[in-house]
């Protein structure tokens, strides 16, 4: 897949997957209406804004890595040709899923809506199951020893302190 097709496919997938999971569903659950919250909640709202903005930034970065480095999309129907291990993927294997969760939790804090925390827990469980039962076996089959080395070196859900450097990567 060339970069233009990968970029278009990634943009469509961005709207359909994280756009729905982190945008449409939270809106459907809350109408994006904030609860009347006490003054002491303000720091939590600020933390929510930070999580939401950081989540959006990480998502854009992760999608860009799939296009530029992987020559494909995050969508299982149009996967990458190359294993994506650069950028934030040097720290954690699943930055895209973590970013979506950060965006949902951020909205929960901004709006003061516990339903979004419960939703984030359900989404997290779905992500973990999808990664375990589909994504990791698929990547192992597609990229073999290279993926296994990456998987051993880079945690799935809690970032490393220092970036991983594959063997032979100056």
Place the predicted regions along the sequence by residue:
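Solvent-exposed interhelical
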Residues: 89
């Amino acid at each position: 897949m060339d970069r233009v097709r990968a970029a278009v496919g990634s943009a469509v997938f961005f709207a359909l997957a994280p756009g729905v999971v982190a945008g449409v569903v939270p809106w459907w659950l809350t109408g994006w209406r904030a609860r009347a919250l006490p003054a002491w909640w303000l720091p939590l709202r600020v933390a929510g804004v930070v999580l939401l903005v950081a989540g959006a930034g990480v998502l854009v970065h992760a999608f860009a890595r799939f296009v530029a480095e992987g020559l494909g999309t995050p969508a299982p129907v149009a996967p990458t040709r190359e294993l994506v291990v650069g950028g934030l993927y040097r720290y954690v294997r699943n930055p895209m899923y973590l970013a979506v969760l950060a965006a949902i939790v951020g909205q929960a804090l901004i709006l003061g809506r516990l339903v979004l925390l419960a939703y984030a827990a359900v989404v997290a469980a779905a992500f973990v199951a999808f990664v375990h039962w589909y994504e990791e076996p698929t990547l192992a089959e597609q990229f073999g020893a290279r993926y296994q080395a990456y998987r051993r070196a880079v945690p799935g859900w809690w970032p490393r302190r220092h970036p991983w450097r594959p063997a032979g990567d100056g």
